């Protein structure tokens, strides 16, 4: 046979063993496997779900005057009213299926 070059640049007079025409390739799996059972559905409750989310607004105070004014404001306002101003509630009702 003619001399052939290998990857390293060395000339060989015979082809590599892995290049033989009658070499058998190992069979690979076709990707099919036993089917998995479908996940069981969870039972839904009869009542609806209410989600309440509360968060506090981010209030930035930049000067001491604002702090003094804020304290005066706090003294004039009922604490329950202030809580209503500073907190917001979000209610979501999810109907039962």
UniProtKB/Swiss-Prot annotation:
Q: Which Pfam family is one of this chain's hits?
A: SPAN-X
Q: Which family does it belong to?
A: Belongs to the SPAN-X family.
Q: Which GO terms describe its cellular component?
A: cytoplasm; nucleus
- Its protein name is Sperm protein associated with the nucleus on the X chromosome C
- The sequence motif named Nuclear localization signal is recorded at 37-45
Q: Does the keyword Membrane apply?
A: no
Disulfide feature: none
As recorded in Swiss-Prot or TrEMBL, the protein's gene is named SPANXC
Q: Where is this region: Disordered?
A: 1-47
List, alphabetically, the InterPro entries matched: SPAN-X_fam
Which domain of life does the protein's organism represent? Answer: Eukaryota
Q: What compartments host this protein?
A: Cytoplasm; Nucleus
What tissues is it present in?
Detected in testis, melanoma and bladder carcinoma.
Keywords carried by this UniProt record: Cytoplasm, Nucleus
